Regions:
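Transmembrane catalytic cores of multi-pass membrane glycosyltransferases
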Residues: 52, 64, 69, 192, ...
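Specific aromatic-rich, kink-prone transmembrane helix
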Residues: 121, 146, 158-176, 207-211
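Membrane-interface transmembrane helices that cradle and orient dolichyl/undecaprenyl
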Residues: 166-181, 282-291
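Short hydrophobic alpha-helices at membrane interfaces in multi-pass membrane enzymes
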Residues: 172-191, 223-228, 296-301
Length: 475
């Protein structure tokens, strides 16, 4: 009898050991799936190409040094002193702190970390839905060409992560459990999100649609808890330095950006990339509906509809769609095919690692094709500068002593101002009148305005490269 008990104990101990080993092995597989995304993120961080990044760093530095958020425009001569509401003040401080610690490489690494957080949350949700780590990781790698261009150093990275966190929390609220604590967690996420980026207001709408979807399922209890989460999230939206003013600011950004900024344009049905991203989202929506996962149905409905109205939401749609697609692919012949052809994946990953190592030599470098470092340094101090939309933010960062005419804070300048300056940049209209208040001009050398200035005796070309030409008024 004692021998039998001992043998049973030994078998039980062995079984527990095997399960623990399996858990550790599976955990390592998910970690490797997450780590495989790192080379692509590093490649994106190698060059800073987004103009917003530069004025956000400078604004964050200003906030830190003054220990107060700027309330009026301090950077331009066209809007100087005009009231200014920041939609990402905490993100600005975050990357400014990274800049103070490690310069532009610190900013690039910080934003790369945010991108990796979003990828990790995507894989976490895929794991909860029953996906294979290999398939989920492979799917993330295959779709990375669609995502990499959107992983620039901007507060939108926070949006990608926050939407996934909300999806995870809402699914747990719908499933039951400690719902009070989960609702409070939604509130905390909302407060952090709205201070990092005003995109949190989109999350409030997403929660409410999830509540409606659960109501349609006749799960009244879960729907009620989701509504409570939505109310808490809505209240959290006003726990920022701007309070209720954030609502008006969000509307102002949308109205000033529509038809001007590319990422705010409607979906282009002739774009294969945009259509592929939307197709992934719609496919995930169908799968979520078939599984009767009404939380994910609600999330995907809102993000897909938003993506049609503004393509800036397409990467968010892909991040939410991948965890839904991965479990289905894990149970199809696709999974076996990927395993048999994994050598192709490994080779592709090896190439990405090599390219990432090359990019690590210039992490955080401003794109030489867009930002003329040497020319900007040649601008005379305190010279009122007429500049192109993209170059303004870089001048704010590199030369805060030079007031600009325009930059990518389009909510500050307004749609009409941006369009009028684009017309002048083309050399059209009454160019002399538009330049009346400027002493210097910094524009790409191939623009109509640059050609006009070369032929005008009142201006002198003082510096030029492939990205920009600097003209100074002759007195």
């Amino acid at each position: 009898m004692a021998v039998a008990v001992a043998e049973a104990g030994a078998r039980n101990s062995t079984s527990q050991g095997d399960r623990a080993a399996a858990v550790r092995s599976r955990g390592r597989s998910w970690f490797l799936a997450w780590l495989a995304f790192l080379p692509l993120v590093v490649m994106r961080a190698g060059t800073l190409a987004e103009s917003d990044t530069f004025w956000q760093i400078r604004t964050g530095l200003l906030t830190i040094s003054h220990r107060a958020i700027p309330t009026v425009d301090p950077f331009s001569w066209t809007m100087h002193g005009r009231p200014w509401t920041l939609n990402s003040w905490a993100f600005n401080v975050l990357i400014a702190g990274a800049y103070r610690l490690a310069g532009l490489p610190g900013v690039a690494w910080t934003c790369a970390g945010l991108a990796m957080v979003a990828a990790g949350l995507m894989l976490f949700l895929a794991r909860e839905l029953g996906a294979s780590p290999f398939v989920a990781g492979a799917l993330l790698l295959f779709t990375s060409p669609l995502l990499v261009g959107w992983l620039s150093a901007r507060p939108q990275l926070v949006d990608y992560a926050a939407v996934l966190v909300l999806a995870i929390l809402l699914r747990r609220i719908a499933a039951g459990g400690k719902r009070i604590w989960l609702v409070l967690a939604v509130g905390i996420v909302s407060v952090v999100w709205v201070n990092l980026h005003a995109g949190e207001l989109f999350g409030v709408g997403m929660i409410c649609v999830c509540a409606v979807a659960l109501f349609a399922k006749r799960d009244l209890r879960a729907s009620g808890w989701c509504l409570a989460a939505g109310a808490v999230a809505f209240a959290g939206s006003f726990l920022s330095p701007y309070g209720f003013g954030m609502l008006g600011q969000a509307a102002q950004v949308q109205s000033a950006s529509a038809g001007v900024v590319i990422e705010w344009q409607h979906l282009d049905p002739t774009s294969p990339t945009q259509c592929a991203m939307l197709a992934m989202g719609l496919g995930a929506l169908i799968l979520a509906a078939r599984r009767r996962d009404f939380v994910l149905v609600g999330v995907l409905c809102v993000v897909a509809a938003g993506s049609i109205m503004a393509i800036r939401l397409l990467p968010m749609l892909v991040f939410v769609a991948l965890p839904v697609l991965a479990p289905s692919l894990s149970r199809t012949p696709v999974a076996s095919l990927l395993l048999r052809r994994r050598i192709v994946l490994y080779l592709g990953l090896a190439v990405a690692v090599v390219l990432a190592l090359i990019d690590m030599s210039h992490i955080g470098r401003p794109s030489p094709a867009l930002y003329p470092v040497g020319v900007v340094r040649d601008i005379p101090s305190d010279c009122r500068l007429f500049n192109s939309y993209e170059l303004g933010a870089f001048v704010i960062f590199e030369r805060p002593d030079v007031p600009v005419s325009l930059d990518s804070r389009n909510d500050m300048y307004g749609r009409q101002r941006v369009l009028a300056d684009e017309k002048t940049l083309d050399g059209k209209g009454d160019v002399a009148r538009e330049l009346a208040g400027a002493d210097c001009v910094l524009v790409p050398p191939a623009t109509g305005l640059a050609k006009w200035l070369r032929s005008d005796h009142g201006w002198k070309l003082t510096a030029s490269d492939s990205a920009a030409a600097l003209f100074v008024r002759i007195r």
